[in-house]
């Protein structure tokens, strides 16, 4: 690797020219990469709810719907508004009771339950159903929602997942750049305190920032990325890959002393040492992200690929761009050096190795409640619930529930040749299910006495088209609640009893599938990440015992972090419980590998157990603390700022996890080394030097 290091030093100017030039195509590519704001679209395409969604789009030309609450408006004004909304690009149909009750079908002919579902006399409001020609996450649909918001603002409210997605887009696009600024500033503050230079932290951030842009610029290979991936990528890549920059800098400082101030030679050797050292840790981090790709819920694949790429770009930038920047700015670095403000914490090492038995007892005592809390976490799946109270969509959903007692809305897709009698009978059976507020089909609205030719063609086309007909079920229960999930199960039984080809779709059925699928995914991802990292540690250290010890200690840190919400009663967004463990495992193993490598080196040189572990800990502590504090600062700041709960919760958990992992690696891991030193030396390569005599 020394040849590579010398090559980087020799061609450092060319490297910087190419690196800065690549920012242009990367930036343009990033700008033109589509962002997907529809989390439910990542469900497997083969499940019935997603197949039904495709039928809705293909057969009815409808992919989503919204409810619009209209307050203090006269019928003629509503009719005008309905026409204006229907003219919007992306809107397919607008349905209110006036759509059905036209001159050919008087108000008296409409069932009271249908009329009452669209009208609330006490609140002086009416309800309008808007259907869209594309899915609820399409750009066209979200743009239509935004235009509707402007048209009906102040006295009207747009509810539903399409509105939630539109609000999410607005918030994320406003806040994502601020996330990066917060993470960068707080990381720089930490490095300013813990390092001896003002310029070097800036160079770290510049190098990592360029790697982030390369990463975002190559997302075109996926076609699109999720908003969650967009929001978290820069922050996580900064936090996760900062280790490599810190390691290069420390190695560079050591090599300068070794080569009497020859900085070019020192940098060449520092690059060589860094490549060797970060290979194992970066591969384990990548493995953690790759584990996310094994999820059936393909949001994991989306985040996993982007973050794995991010680590690769981070490593490449660390051994090419960063060394070139450091050498180019050498004079400025020397002029701006200052005293390190953080106290030397390496003295902790001797205390840890002297009290390892007490620390081991603490490990066991804390482990049991940590596992209990970890297994009793409360998770929520209501995507609308992640929005801040200030979001119009959340206010609209709450008003919809308050004024119309309307929670989730289900859609039944049934064969169009289902008999009128069966259609009416099925709707009657569905009405008997607990929590069903309204169930309608075109046949049930007309009843057995009203002939089809009395129904406006517009209304017919909404409910029947080609081989399928559409029926609506309004539930009193909220999406993702146990009550609505039980309701969905009962309705599915009824629907399938009348037609095996009929399907129940909508936000709530999709969310029920999401719950089932992600529960399995969580177990799969946890198992895959542990196995992959176990195997990598096994290969890197050629040890049977070390993978068990390292993974066990890191899993302990994860149990503690994820166990806290179990005791505080904090509800976590479903995706947090899946990704936190994987990211924390992949990031924390870097600290553990750094310390283990030094421990192995010390034992190989002939040092006894206690001095070897004490020195390894002393030499690693500062690096571990600086890296962990940078990770904490980057994620904690974003967690405090973001008012999107899904992003905020993940960042707060990652921040807390970084601190917990830091303490576990500094205090618990060396204690395990003290206890299992004989086993480790006997079952691992590179711990004993046969050429040394006792």
Name the predicted role of every residue range.
Residues 45-162, 378-546, 552-571:
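Structured non-transmembrane domains adjacent to transmembrane bundles in polytopic membrane proteins
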Residues 1-35, 136-381, 496-694:
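Membrane-embedded transmembrane helical bundles of large multi-pass transporters/channels
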């Amino acid at each position: 690797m020394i040849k590579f290091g010398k090559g980087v030093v020799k061609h450092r100017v060319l490297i910087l020219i190419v690196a800065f030039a690549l920012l242009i195509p990367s930036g343009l590519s990033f700008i033109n990469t589509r962002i997907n704001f529809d989390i439910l679209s990542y469900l497997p395409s083969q499940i019935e709810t997603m197949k039904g969604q495709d039928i809705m789009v293909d057969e009815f030309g409808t992919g989503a719907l919204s409810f619009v609450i209209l307050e203090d408006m006269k019928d003629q004004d509503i009719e005008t508004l309905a026409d204006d909304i229907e003219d919007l690009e992306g809107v397919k149909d607008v349905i209110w009771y006036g759509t059905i009750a036209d001159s050919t079908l008087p108000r008296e002919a409409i069932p009271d339950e249908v009329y009452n579902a669209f009208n609330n006399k006490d609140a002086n409001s009416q309800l309008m159903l808007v259907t869209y020609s594309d899915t609820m996450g399409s750009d066209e649909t979200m743009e239509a929602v935004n235009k509707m918001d402007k048209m009906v603002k102040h006295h009207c409210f747009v509810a539903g997942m399409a509105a939630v997605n539109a609000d999410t887009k607005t918030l994320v696009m406003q806040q994502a750049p601020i996330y990066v600024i917060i993470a960068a500033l707080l990381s720089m503050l930490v490095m300013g305190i813990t390092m001896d230079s003002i310029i070097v932290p800036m160079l770290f951030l510049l190098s990592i920032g360029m790697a982030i842009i390369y990463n975002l610029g190559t997302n075109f290979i996926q076609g699109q990325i999720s908003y969650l991936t967009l929001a978290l990528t820069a922050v996580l890549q900064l936090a996760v890959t900062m280790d490599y920059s810190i390691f290069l800098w420390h190695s560079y400082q050591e090599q300068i002393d070794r080569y009497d101030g020859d900085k070019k030679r020192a940098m060449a050797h520092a690059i060589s040492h860094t490549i060797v050292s970060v290979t194992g840790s970066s591969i384990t981090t990548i493995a953690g992200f790759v584990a996310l790709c094994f999820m059936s819920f393909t949001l994991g694949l989306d985040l996993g690929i982007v973050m794995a790429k991010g680590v690769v770009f981070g490593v490449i930038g660390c051994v090419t761009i960063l060394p070139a920047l450091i050498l180019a700015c050498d004079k400025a670095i020397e002029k701006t050096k200052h005293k390190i403000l953080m106290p030397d914490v390496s003295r902790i090492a001797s205390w840890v190795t002297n009290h390892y038995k007490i620390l081991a007892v603490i490990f066991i005592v804390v482990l049991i409640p940590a596992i209990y809390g970890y297994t009793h976490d409360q998770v929520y799946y209501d995507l609308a619930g992640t929005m801040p109270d200030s979001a119009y969509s959340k206010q609209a959903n709450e008003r919809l529930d308050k004024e119309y007692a309307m929670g989730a809305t289900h859609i039944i897709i049934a064969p169009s040749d289902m008999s009128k009698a069966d259609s009416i009978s099925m709707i009657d059976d569905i009405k008997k299910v607990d929590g069903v507020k309204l169930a309608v089909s075109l046949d049930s609205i007309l009843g057995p006495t009203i002939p089809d030719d009395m129904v406006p063609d517009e209304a017919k086309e909404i409910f029947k088209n080609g081989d399928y007909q559409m029926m609506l079920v309004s539930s009193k229960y909220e999406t993702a609640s146990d009550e609505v999930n039980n309701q969905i199960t009962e309705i599915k039984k009824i629907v399938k009893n009348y037609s095996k080809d009929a399907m129940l779709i909508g936000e709530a059925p999709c969310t029920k599938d999401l719950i089932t699928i992600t529960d399995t995914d969580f177990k799969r991802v946890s198992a895959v990440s542990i196995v992959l990292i176990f195997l990598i540690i096994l290969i890197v250290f050629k040890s049977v015992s070390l993978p068990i010890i390292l993974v066990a200690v890191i899993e302990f840190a994860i149990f503690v972090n994820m166990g806290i919400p179990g005791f505080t009663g904090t509800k976590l967004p479903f995706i947090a419980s899946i990704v936190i463990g994987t990211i924390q495992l992949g990031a924390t193993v870097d600290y553990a590998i750094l310390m283990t490598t030094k421990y192995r080196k010390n034992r190989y040189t002939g040092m006894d157990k206690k001095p070897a572990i004490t020195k390894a800990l002393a030499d690693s502590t500062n690096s571990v603390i600086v890296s962990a504090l940078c990770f904490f600062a980057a994620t904690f700041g974003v967690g405090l700022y973001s008012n999107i709960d899904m992003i905020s919760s993940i960042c707060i958990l990652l921040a807390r996890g970084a601190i917990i992992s830091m303490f576990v690696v500094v205090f618990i891991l060396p204690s395990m080394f003290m206890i299992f030193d004989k086993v480790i030396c006997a079952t691992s390569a590179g711990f004993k030097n046969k050429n040394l005599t006792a």
